[in-house]
Amino acid sequence: MRTVLLVGNWKMNKTASEAAVFVRELKERLPAPSTTIELVVAPPFTALESVRIALGPSSPIQLGAQNLFWDDRGAYTGEVSAPMLTDLGCRYVILGHSERRILFGEQSDHIHKKIRAAHNHGLRPILCIGETLAERDNGTTDHVLTQQLRDGLSGLATETLAAVTVAYEPVWAIGTGKSATVDQAVAAHRTIRRVLAAIASPSIADGTRILYGGSVTPHNIESLLASDQIDGALVGGACLQVESFATIATVASVTRSIGV
């Protein structure tokens, strides 16, 4: 069984000092370390160092980033490279989030280069894909997911493809309080795994963790993880409060430990 992955995407929230306090409190509230789940927090760039220090050398929580640039160095004002992130202790990086695509015009070819750069420097890329409400309503969800996967992953080396985690985030469910139904999420995850098998191989597709992201809360995490097609969650708003994120982690650990 694939290990559940829970990723807390803080977005543009928490100063460095606030982040350190938050992480110390979170560590105290988490369930005992488990082989059934893996936890990642992705603070803003400015808080990565303080979070790394607060986590300590043997923390069960891993450090992630919210973006990177595809070149190692250069005249790219405001950007951060993969070597900079690995030097700070990051293990994961979120790429292609819908907010990056919509607000900043991030294109698929850029995301493709970022995935390659991340893997080349030992980071595990989390590729975000998902449809808008209009695309779901007109019945093109599968087409959109297929195209985003092909644009992001086609042509990458086998070892890079094997390192990728995919996060399905229906755009209409992000920050809206609306969540896809379990049936909707499972159908999308099955499409993603089928396309991954075609792009990479059936074995890579079977081993790839596919997360759900879109108004994940302590109240719906159990029902989401009841399906073996859903391998974890990319958590937004609910990860900004210690109690809610710790509860999500606890429920996830119990759910998968008892094989629900």
Q: Over which residues does each language-model region extend?
A:
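Active-site loop-to-helix "anion-binding N-cap" substructures in soluble metabolic enzymes
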Residues: 1-260
